Amino acid sequence: MKCPKCNSTHSRVVDSRHADEANAIRRRRECENCGTRFTTFEHIEMSPLIVVKKDGTREQFLREKILNGLVRSCEKRPVGYQQLEDITNKVEWRLRDEGQAEVSSREIGKHVMNLLMHVDQVSYVRFASVYKEFKDVDQLLESMQGILQEKNKRSDN
């Protein structure tokens, strides 16, 4: 690593710690030339994931888009931000575990809805109303009946 002060490439690691929920390593370094201390981060490099949208266009996967959609769906609901981060992480890892270079936006939405249903049903309906593009109240009611049936199945077991 180059020293930010003198550009020397000779430094020693003074301290190492996990960062970003163990997805990165934070290293405290000291330049052997000038003594300046600086911090570096080491992250896992992920292969790019491409999202194929409904209209056929392609764009790079951005986890922030999932998180922003979840935040909007969960406004004024008893859902913590960490829960939304967890859902986003699970969705991203599931997509990456599938090993595909491209994934449809529809597939992403299904993963999000499956996880969100078990966290908060009102937020699920809000998310589904945008994702499924309900045309009328009947479609919304159908979705809600599906939630009730799922809930009844779980309570029977």
Curated annotation (Swiss-Prot):
Taxonomy, superkingdom: Bacteria
GO biological process, one term: negative regulation of DNA-templated transcription
Segments forming domain ATP-cone: 49-139
Keywords assigned: ATP-binding, DNA-binding, Metal-binding, Nucleotide-binding, Repressor, Transcription, Transcription regulation, Zinc, Zinc-finger
Cysteine-cysteine disulfides: none
unnamed zinc finger locations on the chain: 3-34
Pfam families xref list: ATP-cone (PF03477), Zn_ribbon_NrdR (PF22811)
The keyword Zinc belongs to this UniProt entry's keyword annotation: yes
Cofactor needs: Zn(2+)
GO molecular function: ATP binding; DNA binding; zinc ion binding
Alphabetical list of InterPro entries matching this protein: ATP-cone_dom, NrdR-like_N, RNR_NrdR-like
Cofactor note: Binds 1 zinc ion.
HAMAP family assigned to the protein according to its UniProt record, in alphabetical order: NrdR
Record PANTHER family: TRANSCRIPTIONAL REPRESSOR NRDR
Family that this chain belongs to: Belongs to the NrdR family.
Function: Negatively regulates transcription of bacterial ribonucleotide reductase nrd genes and operons by binding to NrdR-boxes.
Protein's name in the database: Transcriptional repressor NrdR
Species of provenance: Staphylococcus carnosus (strain TM300)
Native organism taxonomy: Bacteria, Bacillati, Bacillota, Bacilli, Bacillales
